[in-house]
Curated annotation (Swiss-Prot):
Binding site for Mn(2+) 1: 8, 99, 102-103
Domain called HTH dtxR-type: residue spans: 1-63
Name the UniProt record assigns to this protein: HTH-type transcriptional regulator MntR
Subunit structure as annotated in this protein's UniProt entry: Homodimer.
Keywords, alphabetical: Activator, Cytoplasm, DNA-binding, Manganese, Metal-binding, Repressor, Transcription, Transcription regulation
GO biological process: intracellular manganese ion homeostasis
Organism: Geobacillus sp. (strain WCH70)
Organism superkingdom: Bacteria
InterPro entries, sorted: DtxR_MntR_Metal-Reg, Fe_dep_repressor, Fe_dep_repressor_sf, HTH_DTXR, HTH_tscrpt_reg_MntR, Iron_dep_repressor, WH-like_DNA-bd_sf, WH_DNA-bd_sf
Coiled coil ranges: none
Keyword Protease found: no
Positions annotated to bind Mn(2+) 2: 11, 77, 99, 102
Length: 142
């Protein structure tokens, strides 16, 4: 199992490859706000653990294992962002909140959150009911 830090790198590499067709050390460093030397060390570790193949000065490619995990990590992140929007978290807090919790949830919890997101999406009236409850609670706090 990858560590939370490894997950961040795999997720970002997956996103870069999906968007640009490639992922360079400099692109990864910029996206994660870390030094290129840190990226190189992590990429070497990910290569050793067979999440990707890295050739110095030639770039990197995710292995089947890396692609599978990368896809699942992106799904987890996007699902948690959807969940935060549904439950009414302020947009400016969503990314930071998701980054704070995504590594601490089991895949079972992620699957159950997915069920809940689906439940709300299948009937928009459910979201409307939730918003009404939130408004009532906010008014009661005033």
């Amino acid at each position: 199992m990858p560590t939370p830090s490894m997950e961040d790198y795999i997720e970002q590499i997956y996103i870069l490859i999906e968007e640009k067709g490639y992922a360079r050390v400099s692109d990864i460093a910029e996206a994660l706000s870390v030094h290129p030397s840190s990226v190189t060390k992590m990429v070497q570790k990910l290569d050793k653990d067979e999440y990707l193949v890295y050739e110095k000065y030639r770039g990197l490619v995710l292995t089947a294992k890396g692609k599978k995990i990368g896809k699942r990590l992106v799904y987890r992140h996007e699902l948690l962002e959807q969940f935060m929007r549904i439950i009414g978290v302020d947009e400016e807090n969503i990314y930071h909140d998701v980054e704070g919790i995504e590594h601490h949830l089991s895949w079972n919890a992620i699957d159950r959150i997915g069920d809940l997101v689906q439940y709300f999406q299948e009937d928009p009236k459910r979201i409307e009911t939730l918003r009404n409850i939130q408004k009532r609670n906010e008014q009661a706090e005033e």
